[in-house]
């Protein structure tokens, strides 16, 4: 049996955590003894409890300082790896990658690259700091056995910089809401065409511009639901009109997707958005900025139309196009389950793990 440990900053229910959880839930337990190592505080206690009840060993390092970890003070993590005697370490994120690259271990070291660091780090940290973080991260990645990008579009960037890189697209389980929301509860008419955005309200997500353009181009029967919080929340509220519902952070976004028609994102950079996959799983059309990862998922819908792309110059015309698409919710759901499922993602990762095991 292969002993595998997934390593992440902390485990929650969204973002890179959802990729880790989907892998854990879909690997063959007769072949893998699975552990999870979390580095910092911030774990969702419900998720940790469910994992342990499902036979996963969870190590919570609860280290306090991310910067100290990057500077080499990571003894708790090193001790866990030494005692665990793992065959495979699979890290997620810059700090886990850096720590893994410094280990003296016989374990084969995987990582999943969840973003385009050249865009994401620049937007998050500014030019000077982003150069430092990119150099640090690349140096770590080159020491690992395999770097798996979360999309082909991220792979197209990283293949220029890494010799040990491949890609496996993110996939998700079929999503289910934990509650029922009605359109009346959010003051939306039953016959309205409902657009929805779910995510952080920050500059990288370009949400202020999106609201401005929606206000400019929406028709009388169209509404936009905005789920999320963040640094741009006050500015978003100032730009909204009476067709925009600012609903704040919601723990059950799928319930709101179930009363929507179109998922919209004007993000400037994405790895392979889990929210987009969740929207497809709910049968929503996609109305997305024309960044590479968005182009990738829309272009996959060769036999059925799954959405429309826009840029800052043509969004008015793109609104006309999305209105004209004759979509079929059931076919969109089927498209997601056939092409972007957690089961398919896990099968592909299993193949990569097995290759490494055969080499040993």
Residue locations for each model-derived region?
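A charged, aromatic-enriched C-terminal amphipathic alpha-helix characteristic of glycosyltransferases
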Residues: 15, 327-358
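Short hydrophobic beta-strand element within catalytic cores of glycosyltransferases
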Residues: 285-288
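Short His-centered aromatic/hydrophobic patch
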Residues: 91-97, 113
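Aromatic "clamp/platform" in nucleotide-sugar-dependent glycosyltransferases that forms part
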Residues: 249, 268
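N-terminal strand-loop element at the rim of the active site
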Residues: 6-69, 154-157, 230
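A conserved mid-protein helix/loop that constitutes part of the nucleotide-sugar donor-binding site
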Residues: 14-22, 193, 197-216, 231-234
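Donor nucleotide-sugar binding/catalytic pocket of nucleotide-sugar-dependent glycosyltransferases
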Residues: 142-179
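Membrane-proximal helix-turn-helix segments that form the acceptor-binding/catalytic region
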Residues: 75-78, 129-147
